Amino acid sequence: MPNETKRERLRELGALNARPEAVRAPWFRESTFFDPLDLVQVKYEMLRHVQEDGVNKADAAALFGLSRPTYYQAEAAFERDGIAGLLPRTRGPKSAHKLTDEVMQLIEQNQHAGAPLQARSLAELLHSTLGISVHPRSIERAIARKKKR
């Protein structure tokens, strides 16, 4: 795989090491097999270096350009899930998935023109009417997005 293609794919997957220049392990410089851009490989090799070579955890983290807390997080994830634990995880929803068109319509009907936004009371209304729990701040953001359009 060409390097730019791999770099782009790692970025898409969230596995691109933001600081590849900080990886000082010699085998990452001497061999094309080891790629300092691949954060999963960097973390795995850091864990292996401690486990197999008996290196101090703090020293290994520094050698691989990572922090001690990152070492411990990687170690726990690896013990829990194996190599899959080192893969990046997608965090929560990236959109207001509860605020469907139907929900937004109800919000708009109950929002009084010119009156200050009452997100907390709108959230309570959604809970009592539709049985969905929406944080007031999510309602505020959705209304702000709607105004921008």
From Swiss-Prot:
It holds the Pfam family HTH_28. Keywords: Plasmid. To Rhizobium NGR234A y4oM. This is Uncharacterized protein y4bC/y4pJ. It comes from Sinorhizobium fredii (strain NBRC 101917 / NGR234).
